[in-house]
Swiss-Prot record:
Taxonomic lineage: Eukaryota, Rhodophyta, Bangiophyceae, Cyanidiales, Cyanidiaceae
Gene name of this polypeptide: atpH
UniProt GO cellular component terms: chloroplast thylakoid membrane; proton-transporting ATP synthase complex; proton-transporting two-sector ATPase complex, proton-transporting domain
PROSITE patterns: ATPASE_C (PS00605)
Keywords for the protein's UniProt record, in alphabetical order: ATP synthesis, CF(0), Chloroplast, Hydrogen ion transport, Ion transport, Lipid-binding, Membrane, Plastid, Thylakoid, Transmembrane, Transmembrane helix, Transport
Annotated protein name in UniProt: ATP synthase subunit c, chloroplastic
GO molecular function: lipid binding; proton-transporting ATP synthase activity, rotational mechanism
Note: In plastids the F-type ATPase is also known as CF(1)CF(0).
One Pfam family linked to the record: ATP-synt_C
Superkingdom assignment: Eukaryota
Quaternary structure (record): F-type ATPases have 2 components, F(1) - the catalytic core - and F(0) - the membrane proton channel. F(1) has five subunits: alpha(3), beta(3), gamma(1), delta(1), epsilon(1). F(0) has four main subunits: a(1), b(1), b'(1) and c(10-14). The alpha and beta chains form an alternating ring which encloses part of the gamma chain. F(1) is attached to F(0) by a central stalk formed by the gamma and epsilon chains, while a peripheral stalk is formed by the delta, b and b' chains.
Keyword Chloroplast attached: yes
Swiss-Prot/TrEMBL site (Reversibly protonated during proton transport) positions: E61
Membrane topology summary: Multi-pass membrane protein
Length: 81
């Protein structure tokens, strides 16, 4: 029974990282595309657009880091065993 729990934890860790990266990856691509479009329309607003973009990318990346933390806790501090 413990082997099944260990195997399920490894699979869940992989799914946690993979699924946690899908949403932010799509969001970051969309944000970067819109930032480039905004820069093409208004080059004089480059500083403001860049600052907002970097802040929003950091918030989106934090979701992926939370998925990584969940995966690491499933692998090394397994709460099910």
């Amino acid at each position: 029974m413990e082997a099944i729990v260990s195997a399920a934890s490894v699979i869940a860790a992989g799914l946690a990282v993979g699924l946690a990266a899908i949403g932010p990856g799509i969001g970051q691509g969309s944000a970067a595309a819109n930032a480039v479009e905004g820069l093409a329309r208004q080059p004089e607003a480059e500083g403001k657009i860049r600052g907002t973009l970097l802040l929003s990318l950091a918030f989106m990346e934090s979701l992926t880091i939370y998925g990584l933390v969940v995966a690491l806790s499933l692998l090394f501090a397994n709460p099910f065993s």
